[in-house]
Amino acid sequence: IEAVYNYGDEKFEPYLYMGDRICLSDNVHISCVSCLILENDILIGSKVYIGDHSHGSYKVCSPKIEPPANKPLGDIAPIKIGNCCWIGDNAVILAGSEICDGCVIAANSVVKDLKVDKPCLIGGVPAKVIKVF
């Protein structure tokens, strides 16, 4: 679990909030440079990654090739996961995701820029709403 204040020459003011009764399994990686909110009573499976940023932008062609770790962080956007959610093993939750109370994120899903306002099952690559409860 990390709140990143500095990365290379970049400075950040991360806000990382973790509510009560969050159950973390093994090898969970949570990384915040902007805003990451995990509400109460969340079950997080093994090998889950939750991060509000990525390593660099790959949208623009650049003649300069450099190691990914040297690129400035990009794609920065808040993440919020509501109360009583269950995140399955190997799920990846990326920038811009807003998951409401009572949702289940299926194992091996990749959630990016998904905004959900009703309790539901979310799954797939890229993740989408599979079933509303």
Q: Where do the model's predicted regions map?
A:
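Flexible, glycine/small-residue-enriched loop-and-beta-strand segment within the central core
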Residues: 1-93, 125-126, 133
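C-terminal/domain-terminus segments
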Residues: 92-127
